Structure formats: C-alpha cells, structure tokens
Amino acid sequence: MQNTQRRDFLKKSSAAAFGFTLLPSYLATGRSGEGKQPPSKRVNLGCVGVGGRASGVIPSVSANGAATPVAFADVDFSARRVDANLKRYPGVKQFADFRVMLEKMGKDIDAVTVVTPDHTHFPAAMLAMSMGKHVYVEKPLTHSYR
C-alpha cells in the first residue's frame, strides 16, 4: 500500500476542488442556469380557487420553480381577492368552472390545488383524482362521510 504524502494529498484535493468550481451548477443540480426546473421536470398546476387563501397557497406551491400554474378555475375573476394571483401569473388560462378546466386542459395538468370554501372541496378533489391527478386540498375534504 502506498504511503500518501501530505503534499500529494493537497495537490490532488486542490485539483478536485478547482474542477468542481469549473463544473456548471446546472450539471450538478439538474437545474437550468437560472435556477429553474427544465420544462420536462416541472409540475403543471391546475388551480381550483384563486383568491383568498389561494393567494398564499399557489405562490408557496410554486415558489421553488418545480411547479407552475397553467390553469385557474374560479367563479369570480372580477373580485379583488384574485388580483394578486392574476398579476403574479399573467398568462394562465382562466375558467369559471373547474370541470371545464379539467376537461379542456386535463392532458396539460399534472396536479391540482383545491383552495375553495370547505363545502366545495370534495367535488373538485374527487374529479381531479379520478383523472389520475395529484391533488393538494385544504382540510376538511368534506363535512361528512355519509
């Protein structure tokens, strides 16, 4: 077994450290140079409910760039409560009915957020899950299991 000298160890470890500084970060992390996920690895979100609590949920879910809203469903896009998300995500398609959103954009949606009044969680979440979508839903899912 070869006895490693301190000088040789320092040379090799310095060379390795220098090599890693030249390696582009997106090769090591799998992210693009801007720190965003490439489109093939990004989760496309369909968002049911855009105002109120959704003003905090949607940005939180998409904050790290791994998820991007592609469709919004809300019953009233003229309400002030939806303005924050409409300004934050300007090109997102809008639907007044979540069923229409899932029917028309189902192939483009990977996951669904359901952030609506409690009594409306179940229909939206169950339809999305029946289509094989991953779902983030606020509790409770329903008021009763009967």
Question: Which ranges hold each PLM region?
Answer:
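N-terminal glycine-/serine-/threonine-rich beta1-alpha1-beta2 phosphate-ribose binding loop
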Residues: 1-134
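Rossmann-fold NAD(P)-binding glycine/threonine-rich loop
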Residues: 141-146
